[in-house]
Amino acid sequence: MAKTATKVRKKIKKNVAEGIAHVHASFNNTIITITDRQGNALSWATSGGAGFKGSRKSTPFAAQVAAEAAGKVAQECGVKNLEVRIKGPGPGRESAVRALNALGMKISSITDITPIPHNGCRPPKKRRI
């Protein structure tokens, strides 16, 4: 029995001028997602996906490489202006923003949206090394 040919859909190129860069910097990894104003993802990258494994994922350089990767794909979609929202205490916070700025994107605002508990859940115990 002959197989039916699957249709290959051409990816629709979005043309968005303004976007939001969500930087989630944890202690172990950094995730950068660039969305349009409505929250639809245009591009994303992680430190682990950029080729870093283990403890090197949590370095500022790994966050910089991931931000450059996400930023280049977003520039292909036409993004020129960015609003940056940073979440988390990780070491890749600053370097991810600097990498996006170095790509030539105009950053209109930087907002820290790290969730802070008002005495909610008990935090993890302190590490003993």
From Swiss-Prot:
Biological process according to GO: translation
Pfam family, one: Ribosomal_S11
InterPro entries for the chain: Ribosomal_uS11, Ribosomal_uS11_bac-type, Ribosomal_uS11_CS, Ribosomal_uS11_sf
Listed GO CC annotations: ribonucleoprotein complex; ribosome
MF (Gene Ontology): rRNA binding; structural constituent of ribosome
Domain of life: Bacteria
Keyword annotations from UniProtKB, A to Z: Ribonucleoprotein, Ribosomal protein, RNA-binding, rRNA-binding
Family assignment from sequence similarity: Belongs to the universal ribosomal protein uS11 family.
Cross-referenced HAMAP family: Ribosomal_uS11
Task of the protein: Located on the platform of the 30S subunit, it bridges several disparate RNA helices of the 16S rRNA. Forms part of the Shine-Dalgarno cleft in the 70S ribosome.
Quaternary organization: Part of the 30S ribosomal subunit. Interacts with proteins S7 and S18. Binds to IF-3.
NCBIfam families named among the record's database cross-references: PRK05309.1, uS11_bact
Identification of the protein by name: Small ribosomal subunit protein uS11
Gene responsible for this protein: rpsK
